[in-house]
Each structure stands twice: as C-alpha cells, then as structure tokens.
C-alpha cells in the first residue's frame, strides 16, 4: 500500500527515454540496475549490474511484504549502491506490467533514502530497439557500506487503511487492478478474498499506457485525471493492488 507524494529532484528525471539516458550516462555515470534476473546473462545495457526483482520483494508466500531495513541495507550494499549516486532501474519492457516491477524497485529505493532515481521508460527492449549497445559481460559491483533509514512517508499501514475505510482519515483509496479484480469477478492468490477495499475507486494501471505499449505515454492530462477520480488538492492517495506491483505504477 503506497501513499503518493511529490518526487525529490535529482540530476535524473524520474522517467527517462533511452535517448535521454544515453545522453546523460557519460556525464553522471549512474548505477544501472537490471532487475530482469536470468535474462541479464543473455544481454543487458553495457555496465549494468544484475539486481533481480526478487531482491526488493518479500517471500513467495507474500511478495508484497516489506523487507526489514537490515536486509534491504545488506542487499543494497552487495549491489554497490551509494546514496549520493544516480541510479537507473531497468526492466525487460515486454509489456505494461513489466513497468510495475521497475516502479516497485524505484519506490523501495526512494523510501530507503536514495533520491536520484530514474526508470528507463520501455526497459531493455526499448533501449535495444533504439540502437544503443547491449553487452554480455557480467558486472561484479564492489560492495559498499550504507546506513539507510526506511521512511514511512510513502507507506500506509493496515490500521491507517482501516481508518480511511471508516472515514476517519480523508484519503483516496485507489485500486490499480483490472476492473474484473475490482468487481470481484477475478481474484489473485495473494488476496484474502475477491473484491476491493470499501470506498475504493478503480484506476487500472494500464491506463497510463497506449494499448500494447510497454512505455508510459507522455500524453497524460493530469488535471483531467484528478477530476475523473475526484482528487482534491493535496489529498493523499493510497495506491494498492495484490502485491504492490501494479500499485507502484499508479504511485
């Protein structure tokens, strides 16, 4: 469950096209995290570290669960991350759902104190399609030492969500899942029961994409979106789905 808020500015934009990233790599020398797992060995952006999506998620029985700070810190150190160095998150880019993986990693890093972050829009496939180099050398990052603090600023607790459903907190519950899940016609294995949270509105995460595309569209009318959902100025939004994957895209 993710609470929305404004992004902190860095040298990189939160979302970058392959061309934008290619034009800034020499200047900023970002750490590139390839979150695709085994596919990394088949080819990746030159210089990218392999950082499988599962490193940022909970156990198989509850992948949406947050990891404890010590575990996160150890994993970030093994990836050679530095708090003051730009980081690029790269998914496969095979479909719109892939973006949720990158967004979930982005959210986890941001909540852990990393401020200069970007997602490669369209992922590795968009990078390769644009003609930029792909390599197969396995990068072994040098471990770092970190002391992170995980902020709860963008996390909603169960107790807080219950208060929202009771009208005790003025926040908007936003269900990122397809309409069939929202209506209870389908159910994910991770869900306790079919349906949605009381009072929640539905905004399918794929609405941010042109049908069939893996990159988020730039033609998003924010004012119209706020009006459609009835979002008030400065109102907090609690984004949710089944495991924090699709919800991260809406966040």
Predicted regions span which residues?
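Flexible, polar/low-complexity N-terminal or interdomain linker segments that lie immediately upstream
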Residues: 7-40, 124-190, 195
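Extracellular/periplasmic catalytic domains that process cell-envelope and extracellular macromolecules
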Residues: 24-27, 41-45, 80-83, 98-101, ...
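Thiolate-centered catalytic microenvironments shared by cysteine-dependent enzyme domains
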Residues: 70-160, 164, 186, 195, ...
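Helix-loop module immediately N-terminal to the HCX5R catalytic loop
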Residues: 58-86, 205-237
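Structural recognition of the beta-strand scaffold that forms the well-ordered cores
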Residues: 31-34, 48-52, 85-91, 118-119, ...
